[in-house]
Amino acid sequence: MFTLKKSLLLLFFLGTISSSLCEQERDSDDEDQGEVTEQVVKRLVRGCWTKSYPPKPCFVRG
């Protein structure tokens, strides 16, 4: 019974650490996605509105 409790405690501890690491990575990925979106929007607006009037449809190339 004592070894079962130790095993369950160890699994809980490792699961908690794994969960927190995944959450941190997910949060950092979300922040990176926001920055990429801002860059694409800035590129899109600058390319469309400054080169011609009336603006032509723009296609963003990654």
UniProtKB/Swiss-Prot annotation:
Pro-peptide positions on chain: 21-41, 62
One Pfam family matching this protein: FSAP_sig_propep
Keyword DNA damage applies: no
Leader sequence segment: 1-20
Compartment(s): Secreted
Gene Ontology biological-process entries: defense response; defense response to fungus; defense response to Gram-positive bacterium; inflammatory response; killing of cells of another organism; mast cell degranulation
UniProt GO cellular component terms: extracellular region
Keyword Disulfide bond assigned: yes
Keywords, sorted A to Z: Amphibian defense peptide, Antibiotic, Antimicrobial, Cleavage on pair of basic residues, Cytolysis, Disulfide bond, Fungicide, Hemolysis, Inflammatory response, Mast cell degranulation, Secreted, Signal
Disulfide bridge positions per record: 48-58
Tissue: Expressed by the skin glands.
Sequence similarity: Belongs to the frog skin active peptide (FSAP) family. Brevinin subfamily.
Role noted for this protein: Mast cell degranulating peptide. Antiproliferative activity against human breast and ovarian tumor cell lines in vitro. Inhibits granulopoiesis in rat in vitro. Causes histamine release from rat peritoneal mast cells in vitro. Has antibacterial activity against Gram-positive bacteria B.megaterium Bm11, S.lentus and M.luteus, and antifungal activity against C.tropicalis, C.guiller-mondii and P.nicotianae spores. Has hemolytic activity. The mature peptide inserts into the hydrophobic core of the bacterial cell membrane and increases permeability without disrupting membrane integrity.
Designated name of the protein: Peptide leucine arginine
Naturally occurring in which organism (per UniProt): Lithobates pipiens (Northern leopard frog)
